[in-house]
Amino acid sequence: MARLKEFYRDTVMKQLMEKFQYSNVMEVPRITKITLNMGLGEAVGDKKIIEHAVSDMTAIAGQKPVVTKARKSIAGFKIRDDYPIGCMVTLRREAMYEFLDRLVNVALPRVRDFRGLNPKGFDGRGNYNMGIKEQIIFPEVDYDKIDALRGMNISITTTAKNDEEARALLSAFSFPFKH
């Protein structure tokens, strides 16, 4: 079992039960999924970019991403229907907890000039979104093999009812929020 999953079950649930006075353990918020999304607008000119992004994302997430395609043609962006314009991967269960562990304890401390995560990333319904500017903060990505620095969006979906509960949940997992 993943280290953070055990930590959640043994420690975080008890903390949140006391803090929010839940009457049932099923009321305690939990993380349901983590979605990684990499938008690749520059892939319009070069199809190799998608392959590199997919290999980076596979190394980071531990599972193969889905290539996202344009839904409709937009002449201003030089894209047509079904052009590959990004890739995404959804992590659940064990893989999700493993990724969360690596994100908080390994990747975020490697970000240059890191001052904490923006507390405004909550959406009002208990979910958190954050952006990463470079994929090289993950140790799984080989620095010598990357062709360009690419960022990604990380979406953490929880069962929390509001931002306060979600923030308490993520803080319990030692997310480094700015004050």
Curated annotation (Swiss-Prot):
Key word Ribosomal protein present: yes
Alphabetical UniProt keywords: Ribonucleoprotein, Ribosomal protein, RNA-binding, rRNA-binding, tRNA-binding
Domain of life: Bacteria
Cellular component terms (Gene Ontology): ribonucleoprotein complex; ribosome
GO MF annotations, alphabetized: rRNA binding; structural constituent of ribosome; tRNA binding
Keyword RNA-binding: yes
InterPro entries: Ribosomal_uL5, Ribosomal_uL5_bac-type, Ribosomal_uL5_C, Ribosomal_uL5_CS, Ribosomal_uL5_dom_sf, Ribosomal_uL5_N
Gene Ontology annotations of biological process type: translation
PROSITE patterns recorded: RIBOSOMAL_L5 (PS00358)
Assembly and interaction partners: Part of the 50S ribosomal subunit; part of the 5S rRNA/L5/L18/L25 subcomplex. Contacts the 5S rRNA and the P site tRNA. Forms a bridge to the 30S subunit in the 70S ribosome.
Protein function: This is one of the proteins that bind and probably mediate the attachment of the 5S RNA into the large ribosomal subunit, where it forms part of the central protuberance. In the 70S ribosome it contacts protein S13 of the 30S subunit (bridge B1b), connecting the 2 subunits; this bridge is implicated in subunit movement. Contacts the P site tRNA; the 5S rRNA and some of its associated proteins might help stabilize positioning of ribosome-bound tRNAs.
Similarity annotation: Belongs to the universal ribosomal protein uL5 family.
Protein name as annotated: Large ribosomal subunit protein uL5
Gene that encodes the chain: rplE
